[in-house]
Amino acid sequence: MSRPRKRWRDVDGVFLLDKPQGMSSNDIMQKVKRLFQANKAGHTGALDPLATGMLPICLGEATKFSQFLLDADKRYLVTAKLGERTDTSDAEGQVVETREVHVETPQILTALEQFRGDILQVPTMFSALKHNGKPLYEYARQGITVEREARPITIFELNFIEYHAPFLTLEVHCSKGTYIRTLVDDLGEVLGCGAHVTMLRRTAVADYPVAEMMPINELQLLAESFPLSELDRLLLPTDTAVSKLPALHLDVEQSKAIGFGQRVKFANEQQLSGQVRLFSAENLFLGVALIDGNIIRPQRLITQSA
């Protein structure tokens, strides 16, 4: 007798996954999607298979706002091994160079200074960035090196945690587009000994609370033991993906017009500009709009349930 087919459903919100080591971000996202039986899912910035930690999974209408989390600041805890460079700049790659380590803590503290603030970083060849429509890692696996332009990034904080040679642990608060593997590789070159990542854990995305993260095995157990309604209680509201934007509450007529995708005039007593979160008179999240003087221009709107 065949198993009953799983019924997929519309479910909206953000699930804070504590990603396990050894799985790709896409594979683990698909598993979360299946457990919630969600029609639609998307993650908010890939973590390497080696990495663990916070991976917000957007379900349903929340996928419309995943770009805001892709663009958000991130925090990481990283351990590097000095004295070895690998082709991927992490422990999953092949060692391509070995050097002796004659590095003391004061040298590390001095070297860290040049990586703080606004810097330029050349992305690793083992990345999903595309060249002529093809991911760089595909070229790298064929032994081909493609010239990459340095990209501007910001390292807001780069904190020394501990050093027990040859292992160095750092805490990083960085902008979007930062490759921690490249940061470690570049630091190793400044120190003159080379380095690669042996442990990487993302500890924060935007302002999401670490305490709300859940490992996939716990979610699996809940899915096997409780109805979907209990799983839905784990989801954070869709508007948390855009929580850094100022909020604008509309009246009934304004909400109706916005719902039809129309531009709306308003008094703009708060002197708002740029992007805002829109809420109805009943405090329902409507989506994101752009404020242009006293005009509200809808950009991404929630499809309201009938």
UniProtKB/Swiss-Prot annotation:
It holds the Pfam family TruB-C_2. Its EC number is 5.4.99.25. InterPro entries: PsdUridine_synth_cat_dom_sf, PsdUridine_synth_N, PUA-like_sf, PUA_sf, tRNA_psdUridine_synth_TruB, tRNA_sdUridine_synth_fam1_C, TruB_C. It is an enzyme of class 5 (isomerase). It catalyses: uridine(55) in tRNA = pseudouridine(55) in tRNA. Gene3D superfamilies: Pseudouridine synthase, PUA domain. GO terms for molecular function: RNA binding; tRNA pseudouridine(55) synthase activity. The active site is at D48 (nucleophile). Coiled coil: none annotated. Keywords: Isomerase, tRNA processing. It comes from the Bacteria. The keyword 4Fe-4S does not apply. The keyword Isomerase applies. GO terms for biological process: mRNA pseudouridine synthesis; tRNA pseudouridine synthesis. SUPFAM superfamilies: Pseudouridine synthase, PUA domain-like. Responsible for synthesis of pseudouridine from uracil-55 in the psi GC loop of transfer RNAs. HAMAP family: TruB_bact. Belongs to the pseudouridine synthase TruB family. Type 1 subfamily. This is tRNA pseudouridine synthase B. It comes from Haemophilus influenzae (strain PittEE). The lineage of its organism: Bacteria, Pseudomonadati, Pseudomonadota, Gammaproteobacteria, Pasteurellales. The gene is truB.
